[in-house]
């Protein structure tokens, strides 16, 4: 297995890389920084997030590729930007915690294929992030 990283925020370039590399997984960090230069709006705007999210959804379905989209959250804990992004995806996960505490919680807010009544508790230690049993 090989891993490729690209530093790119243009959706057309990202799609081109996907078509050339044929990956099994795409991770976008973050959707609010991706831009379609054909649109007259800023990265992170509702128009950009909707269009770029839709383009990622299309390529994932066409090529049977899993896509993980990282997004920003507001201080209140809701997903920043247009709510419709949540409706486009199958699963919404929140990773919660802060530097003052060693534990982090992975909480499911939406799961089209299963329960949202489970959480994962992780601990940050000298080995990195570890599942806490």
Segments from the language model and where they lie:
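Conserved inter-motif catalytic segment of the P-loop NTP-binding fold
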Residues: 1-55
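Long C-terminal interaction/binding lobes of large macromolecular proteins
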Residues: 28, 67, 83
């Amino acid at each position: 297995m090989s891993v490729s990283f690209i530093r790119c925020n243009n959706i057309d370039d990202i799609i081109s890389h996907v078509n050339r590399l044929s990956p099994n997984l795409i991770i976008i960090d973050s959707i609010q920084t991706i831009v379609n230069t054909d649109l007259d709006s800023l990265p992170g705007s509702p128009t950009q997030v909707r269009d770029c999210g839709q383009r990622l959804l299309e390529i994932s379905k066409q090529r049977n590729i899993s896509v993980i989209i990282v997004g920003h959250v507001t201080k209140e804990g809701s997903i920043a930007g247009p709510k419709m992004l949540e409706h486009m995806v199958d699963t919404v996960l929140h990773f919660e915690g802060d530097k003052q505490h060693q534990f982090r919680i992975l909480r499911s807010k939406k799961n089209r294929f299963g329960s949202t009544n489970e959480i994962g508790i992780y601990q940050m230690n000298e080995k990195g992030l570890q599942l806490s049993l």
